[in-house]
């Protein structure tokens, strides 16, 4: 345990007191259940007790939520969205909401400024022996054991090849562009698919987070255009006000999933040729049949009513690909008419490229400044003009995808049922739960029913910035974002990074924004969105604990979402447990920003059965519907790149088919359940 307790947030002091009391009163410091069917009163309740966050003024924008969800699911899974006609949102979120591919999934430490691979190289095929990335001599669960290997390489998801965007052609799924020489992601001079600089988190249960992405840059407030919420005070959507087309700022709260959704489709790492903007994405998608190259299962819980005469026989779906409605029709049915019904052409402002920044190698393009609307009587669109529906496509896309992802709630695991008093856990699983709550200290960061402190239901009660006792001294930090020393702070500063807006660049962290607010240097337009620091005047504390901090992920379905951490550097749950038991990888190097609960766990050192108990508990967090892709986790057919064929000219993609499944999931299709990353045993060190 850390030496300092008196300056910790109240909720942590209460948890420490509970830990001490129960350790003293329980035999050997292990909790015991008093009833075979009793829920554990110290554990979080079932996730079914948590309301799904939603914008309070949603009805002002959406007139048919059911159709909006259909639109969102179609867009999320549609491969035509990518600049290459291949990359869908789902391309990186098809396996329990995450990514299980193993070839061309590695990148160098780009966020540390490193462009050199330590392991494998581009198009490498991952193997079990590559993990963990940070290795110690035995015993690996002790901080004193020497380091024998370490790399700042990452495992993430392959995206697009580096390509300069030049235009879209109506009816074509592939954008026009010029393939560029990629200095990093190339094999013998051939540009291959780039790999994202951070591991892919799961989209399942993401609706419960106040902010999304590992660094939280997907703002809780959706501005209709990009991930950065009110930080971009120039972002606008177009509203038809009684025949007058106006640019209006959008500030839609509890919408970090919408903010997140509009980022990747313009990212020159993930889905886009660089220089593409949202109106051009809109023009392209509105000219295409939704899911036009993918089969949709007739029993799909959301899209089934829109399928084109399809039939399912086992894992095969026959008939015609796509849907029987257009994207324009779905938008018109889903959204209030003032956001799409103008006949005026829109001339947008100057094109601006944002990024890369010192902490983010990605870039994206958007139009800046005021736009001009043409006289509707002048007929067809002029050169360079867009329709209102095209110009607002980012708004439709973000909100529709958010509403679809809000249906991806995994709240029926064995742990949920146990906490509801409906089933029993095994003795081993209950011992693991006790370790999770007490000796392991896991609950300190993985709190609440989502098993993360970064969620809406916790942060709205406890506050988004707290004052915390560090190993030495005190600091302000963003609740739910922690430096746990899995990588060096200098390898990726995470929450300590900046947005691409402002000079100097506006920070991501509420702690830093709060300090700027106190100092009087915060831009005036951001003041309403930044809470005061929790420090009564006169307050001289200026220290921030934000560098190297990342959003605490939820743990549900963690069996299926490896590799783990923001760098993807651990392949099994046992490797994760051993990391925490030894007190992290770099506790001394990261001491200035280290979460004070990251310390050696003596109870588990050399205690294999205790570690196995903890892993066994983590496996109770799997929702069987996720594992079997049963409703609401069913989906259309998808083809994902799984590396490039080095034996062919130009190194074409090797494609992996993800078959369409309906409400009955994989069992109804005769498919096996989803597997762990690389098929590894979760108990394997």
Region locations from a protein language model:
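Post-cleavage N-terminal segment of exported redox proteins
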Residues: 2-75, 95-98, 120, 293, ...
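Periplasmic c-type cytochrome electron-transfer domains
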Residues: 40, 129-372, 384-406, 569, ...
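Short glycine-rich, low-complexity/disordered patches
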Residues: 271-274, 589-593
């Amino acid at each position: 345990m850390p030496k300092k307790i008196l300056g910790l947030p109240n909720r942590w002091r209460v948890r420490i007191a509970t830990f001490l009391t129960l350790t003293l009163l329980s035999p050997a410091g292990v909790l015991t259940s008093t009833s075979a069917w009793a829920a554990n009163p110290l554990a979080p309740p079932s996730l079914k007790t948590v309301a799904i966050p939603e914008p309070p003024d949603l009805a002002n924008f959406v007139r048919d939520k059911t159709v909006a969800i259909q639109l969102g699911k179609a867009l999320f899974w549609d491969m035509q969205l990518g600049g290459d006609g291949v990359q869908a949102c789902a391309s990186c979120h098809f396996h329990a909401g995450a990514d299980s591919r193993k070839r061309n999934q590695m990148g160098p430490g780009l966020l540390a400024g490193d462009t050199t691979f330590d392991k494998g190289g581009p198009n490498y095929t991952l193997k079990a022996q590559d993990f963990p990335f940070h290795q110690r001599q035995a015993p690996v669960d002790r901080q004193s054991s020497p380091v024998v290997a370490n790399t700042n390489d990452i495992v993430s998801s392959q995206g697009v090849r580096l390509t300069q965007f030049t235009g879209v052609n109506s009816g074509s799924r592939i954008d026009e562009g010029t393939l560029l020489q990629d200095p990093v992601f190339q094999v013998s001079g051939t540009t291959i698919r780039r790999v994202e600089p951070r591991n892919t988190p799961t989209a399942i249960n993401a609706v419960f987070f106040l902010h999304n992405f590992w660094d939280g840059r997907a703002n809780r407030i959706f501005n209709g255009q990009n991930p950065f919420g009110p930080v971009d005070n120039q972002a606008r959507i177009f509203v038809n006000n009684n025949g007058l087309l106006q640019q209006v700022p959008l500030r839609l709260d509890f919408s970090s999933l919408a903010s997140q959704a509009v980022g990747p489709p313009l990212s020159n790492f993930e889905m886009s040729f660089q220089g593409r903007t949202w109106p051009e994405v809109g023009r392209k998608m509105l000219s295409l049949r939704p899911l036009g190259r993918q089969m949709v299962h007739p029993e799909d819980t959301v899209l089934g009513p829109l399928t084109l005469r399809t039939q399912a026989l086992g894992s095969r779906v026959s008939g015609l690909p796509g849907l029987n409605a257009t994207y324009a029709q779905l938008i018109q049915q889903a959204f209030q008419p003032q956001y799409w019904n103008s006949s005026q052409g829109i001339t947008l402002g100057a094109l601006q490229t944002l990024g890369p920044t010192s902490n983010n190698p990605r870039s994206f393009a958007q139009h800046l400044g005021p736009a001009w609307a043409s006289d509707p009587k002048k007929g067809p669109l002029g050169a360079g003009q867009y329709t209102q529906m095209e110009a607002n496509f980012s708004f439709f896309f973000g909100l529709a995808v958010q509403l679809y992802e809000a249906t991806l709630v995994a709240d029926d695991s064995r742990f949920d049922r146990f906490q509801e008093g409906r089933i029993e856990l095994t003795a081993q699983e209950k011992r693991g739960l006790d370790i999770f709550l007490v000796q392991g200290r896991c609950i300190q960061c993985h709190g609440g029913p989502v098993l993360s402190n970064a969620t809406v239901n916790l942060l709205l009660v406890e506050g988004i910035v707290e004052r915390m006792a560090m190993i030495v001294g005190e600091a302000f930090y963003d609740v739910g974002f922690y430096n746990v020393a899995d990588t060096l702070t200098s390898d990726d500063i995470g929450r300590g990074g900046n947005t691409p807006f402002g000079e100097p660049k506006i920070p991501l962290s509420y702690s830093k924004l709060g300090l700027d607010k106190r100092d009087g240097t915060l831009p005036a337009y951001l003041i309403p969105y930044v809470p005061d620091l929790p420090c009564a005047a006169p307050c001289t504390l200026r220290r921030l604990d934000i560098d190297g901090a990342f959003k605490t992920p939820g743990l549900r379905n963690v069996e299926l979402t490896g590799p783990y951490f923001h760098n993807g550097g651990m392949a099994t749950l046992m490797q994760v447990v051993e990391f925490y038991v030894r007190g992290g990888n770099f506790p001394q190097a990261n001491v200035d920003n280290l979460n004070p609960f990251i310390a050696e766990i003596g109870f588990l050192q050399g205690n294999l059965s205790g570690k196995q108990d903890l892993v066994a508990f983590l496996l109770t967090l799997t929702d069987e519907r996720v594992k079997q892709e049963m409703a609401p986790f069913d989906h259309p057919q998808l083809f994902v790149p799984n590396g490039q064929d080095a034996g062919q000219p130009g190194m074409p993609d090797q494609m992996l088919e993800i078959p369409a499944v309906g409400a009955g999931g994989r069992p109804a299709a005769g498919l096996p359940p989803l597997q762990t990353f690389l098929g590894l045993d979760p108990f394997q060190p």
